[in-house]
C-alpha cells in the first residue's frame, strides 16, 4: 500500500472529522442567520407593533382669540384644508379624519374631500375630541395622532416620526416632537418648552423657560427645546385619558400633556429641525402667507 494512501480507518476518521467541521460551520452559519433575523425583526418591528395609525385633526369654530380660525382663508384655501392636505402626505397614516362639533367646518371639509366625524361641543380639548372621534371610527387603530388644525405648514416627516417613535417605544403611551427654541421666544408663554432625559423621554413641559438658571436670563449656549403641537397616543391609552382626573401641574400650566406625566405614564419625544408655524392670532395669517410665497406653495 503506498505510503501516502490512507487506510480505510483513517479515511473514515478523516471523513467523519470533515463532516463534523461542516456541521459545526453550518450550525454557526445558521446561528448567525438567526441572530441577524432577530435583529432585523426588532428593527422592523414597527411594521407589526402598533402598526395601524389614524390622523385626527380636531377643529372648533369658537375661540376666544380667533373665532372661526379653521375657516380663515390662507392664499385662497381654508386653513383646515391647508392642514389636511399636508397631513395627507404622511406615509405612516392609514386614515385621516377631521373631528369637529361645528356644521360649518364639517361642510367645508366635506367639500374638499375630507372625512368628517361630528363630535360633541362638550369636549374640553383636542385630545378629548380625538378620543370621541376614535370611538366612532369603524376600524381599529393602534395609534392616534392628534394634529392641530392651525398648522397649515406641518411637515409630514414630523407626523411619521411621531408615529415611528411610539412604535419603537413599547413602554410609552404618548409621543410628541420638539425643535430648537429661538432666543426671541424664550419668555413667550405661548411657546411651550420641554426638557427630556438621556433616553428621549419627556421630563417636563412649561410655559416658562426650562431649565431656568439662577441668573434669570436665557443662556445663549444652552439648547432649549420648543414643543410642537402634535401628539401621538396609544389608542388604548387615549380611550382612558379623558377619565384621568386633572392634575395640579396640568391646571397650573394649562398644558394637557402634563396630565400624562403626572399620572406616571411615559412620553417619547423626537427632535426635529423644522420650525413651528402655527396660527394663534389673526396677525399670524399674513406671516404664513408670506412664508408660503417664499416656498412657492400654491
UniProtKB/Swiss-Prot annotation:
Names of required cofactors: Mg(2+)
Protein name: 3-deoxy-manno-octulosonate cytidylyltransferase
Family: Belongs to the KdsB family.
InterPro entries to which the protein is assigned, alphabetical: Cytidylyl_trans, KdsB, Nucleotide-diphossugar_trans
Job of this protein: Catalyzes the production of the sugar nucleotide CMP-3-deoxy-D-manno-octulosonate (CMP-KDO). CTP is the preferred nucleotide donor, and it can partially be replaced with UTP but not with ATP. Activates KDO during the biosynthesis of rhamnogalacturonan II (RG-II), a structurally complex pectic polysaccharide of the primary cell wall. RG-II is essential for the cell wall integrity of rapidly growing tissues and pollen tube growth and elongation.
Organism for this UniProt entry: Zea mays
Example of a GO MF term: 3-deoxy-manno-octulosonate cytidylyltransferase activity
Known catalytic reactions: 3-deoxy-alpha-D-manno-oct-2-ulosonate + CTP = CMP-3-deoxy-beta-D-manno-octulosonate + diphosphate
Taxonomy of the source species: Eukaryota, Viridiplantae, Streptophyta, Embryophyta, Tracheophyta
